[in-house]
């Protein structure tokens, strides 16, 4: 089976490629804009693909004819999407259309070719009035990012492909070169330095370990799943509770953590106050089994230590 991953230089993309290249019977094609930034270079094929370049998307998909595409690439900086709307549309809407169009055209030309598209989406498509949420909840986006991701979902759902949408929440983990921060590393670093941090207590999420999300996406492919699936962590936490758990794990001073309200933080884009997902469907249909948040912190900590010791 050939599985093509978009956004292979990103957090989820890296986890997907490394998991797929270790599995028998799977040929992984990693794609991203620019050069391959993964440290491990063997076990997969790398093909540059800028998803905003319609011609290149068509060429790469025609060349490889993947059995499944896991579309992990996106513009995910919520505030940047609010201020750079054209770039947001190019990445989160137009690129989805290019992938769908190319796969549909290839499917039409070859009746035996039935590719699957696994598309990543977000809890931010909801307005956050309540949670946790199941797959049947009605979207109501509050930001340009959220609107763009919902439009991407609509393109996938109206396609003639076999498709699955993996909605997820607040993904955390580390990339090869540890160049990207996340809420866990941010809290740890500031508390270790004795800095006071303001953390909102009125936003609730089900934080998702990147490895778990990668496993969920791969299960969607292996099970030939169709439809929308919530693929997130299982612990429903406020952001304040989340940061307290980080402090507990590392034995850091929780008195440095100051509760605050979302209204006190000035950001270009609105965030939904309460999301988080009910993941019963993924557990039942796919055998999805995510880590607890504390287990996720432990795994990340072990990964950081192994990189530092090399």
What do these predicted ranges mean?
Residues 199-204, 229-237, 285:
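Glycine-rich Rossmann NAD(P)(H)-binding loop
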Residues 3-23:
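N-terminal Rossmann NAD(P)H-binding glycine-rich loop of SDR-like oxidoreductase domains
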Residues 216, 223-268, 273-274, 308-310:
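Mid/C-terminal beta-alpha module of Rossmann-like enzyme folds, strongest
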Residues 154-205, 212:
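NAD(P)-dependent short-chain dehydrogenase/reductase
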Residues 83-118, 155:
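NAD(P)-cofactor binding segment of oxidoreductase domains
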Residues 293-310:
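Amphipathic terminal alpha-helices
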Residues 75-78, 83, 120-143:
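Active-site "gating" loop of Rossmann-like NAD(P)-dependent oxidoreductase/epimerase domains
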